[in-house]
């Protein structure tokens, strides 16, 4: 009798995205159990190295969002323990999480990125560092956590930036606001998926819009001219390759269709640990490509390796 592969689904953690990680992890663990795997759900705490060393799984499916699962930390632990794992490796994870550095790498590879500055929280809190409208975001956080938009010159910088218990780090990325359609595309099995257009009532695709049922509407395929649609797909794969990503990644874009051709297309960021909840984008994009949720999760496990 063939031994069932033992998969440790790493979920939870201590980042601001813990709740989403728990939901992603549960959905994937349930899928793996349906597929016949032996599954252990591991809520990641700071003793994770000891826990995994004792557990000795065959594979780790990383379903962590934010630190320590998306910044290269958990990947380094898994490399040290010799446990094959899913998604991107140490370097690509750390690089993609550090938004300012990721932008530099993508721009060098010909992927258009938003104009922006990396500054201290104190600098951003005391004055307009560029003419509004602009977006303020943590250098190293995801799921639109800690993101603010300043639209008018008479507005003061967000008061939250003055908080003594500000949890999102002292370095902030301030980017010129890019108007237009919100688009997203993923890389699955080494190929770009279709493109989703995200329509929501909020100013930007924030945490609530991403993870609350009905928080946004998804148009798939996105209502774009064919050459623009294909350019989004091309740039998604180019960004994935430039950052050294592996497994599944997702790239987010804005497209201002008032600008001729594809000049209004801007890549906002690449997510190396995209959500896998019931409202997440990657499962929807995979389904459009004929890949069921269970098939997608099983592929992530079978694709796992070291040295990613």
UniProtKB/Swiss-Prot annotation:
It is an enzyme of class 6 (ligase). GO terms for molecular function: ATP binding; D-alanine-D-alanine ligase activity; metal ion binding. Pathway: Cell wall biogenesis; peptidoglycan biosynthesis. It is found in: Cytoplasm. Binds 2 magnesium or manganese ions per subunit. It comes from the Bacteria. InterPro entries: ATP-grasp (IPR011761), ATP_grasp_subdomain_1 (IPR013815), D-Ala_lig_Van_CS (IPR000291), D_ala_D_ala (IPR005905), Dala_Dala_lig_C (IPR011095), Dala_Dala_lig_N (IPR011127), PreATP-grasp_dom_sf (IPR016185). One of its GO terms (cellular component) is cytoplasm. Its cofactor is Mg(2+); Mn(2+). Mg(2+) 1 binds at residues 252, 269. Residues 103-302 form the ATP-grasp domain. The keyword Manganese applies. SUPFAM superfamilies: Glutathione synthetase ATP-binding domain-like, PreATP-grasp domain. Gene3D superfamilies: 3.40.50.20, ATP-grasp fold, A domain, ATP-grasp fold, B domain. It catalyses: 2 D-alanine + ATP = D-alanyl-D-alanine + ADP + phosphate + H(+). One of its GO terms (biological process) is cell wall organization. Its EC number is 6.3.2.4. Belongs to the D-alanine--D-alanine ligase family. Mg(2+) 2 binds at residues 269, 271. Cell wall formation. ATP binds at residues 130-184. Keywords: ATP-binding, Cell shape, Cell wall biogenesis/degradation, Cytoplasm, Ligase, Magnesium, Manganese, Metal-binding, Nucleotide-binding, Peptidoglycan synthesis. This is D-alanine--D-alanine ligase. Pfam families: Dala_Dala_lig_C, Dala_Dala_lig_N. Transmembrane segments: none annotated.
């Amino acid at each position: 009798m063939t031994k069932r592969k033992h998969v440790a689904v790493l979920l939870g953690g201590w980042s601001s995205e813990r709740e989403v990680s728990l939901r992603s992890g549960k959905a994937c663990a349930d899928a793996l159990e349906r597929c016949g795997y032996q599954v252990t759900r591991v809520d990641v705490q700071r003793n994770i190295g000891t826990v995994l060393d004792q557990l000795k799984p065959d594979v780790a499916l990383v379903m962590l969002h934010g630190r320590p699962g998306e910044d290269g930390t958990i990947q380094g632990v898994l490399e040290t323990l010799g446990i094959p794992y899913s998604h991107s490796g140490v370097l690509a994870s750390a690089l993609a999480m550090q938004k300012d550095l990721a932008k530099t790498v993508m721009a060098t590879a010909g992927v258009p990125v938003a104009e922006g500055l990396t500054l201290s929280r104190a600098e951003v809190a005391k004055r307009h560092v560029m003419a509004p409208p602009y977006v303020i975001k943590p250098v190293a956080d995801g799921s639109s956590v800690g993101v603010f938009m300043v639209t008018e010159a008479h507005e003061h910088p967000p008061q939250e930036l003055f908080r003594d218990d500000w949890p999102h780090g002292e370095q902030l990325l301030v980017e010129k606001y890019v108007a237009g359609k919100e688009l997203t595309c993923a890389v699955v099995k080494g190929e770009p998926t279709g493109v989703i257009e995200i329509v929501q009532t909020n100013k930007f695709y924030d945490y609530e819009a991403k993870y609350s049922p009905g928080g946004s509407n998804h148009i798939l395929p996105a209502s774009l001219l064919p050459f623009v649609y294909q350019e989004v797909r091309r740039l998604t794969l180019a960004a994935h390759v430039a950052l050294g990503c592996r497994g599944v990644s997702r790239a987010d874009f804005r497209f201002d269709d008032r600008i001729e051709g594809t000049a209004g297309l801007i890549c906002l960021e690449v997510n190396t640990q995209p959500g896998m909840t019931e409202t997440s984008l990657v499962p929807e994009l995979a389904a459009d490509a004929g890949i069921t949720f269970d098939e997608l999760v099983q592929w992530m496990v079978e694709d796992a390796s070291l040295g990613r």
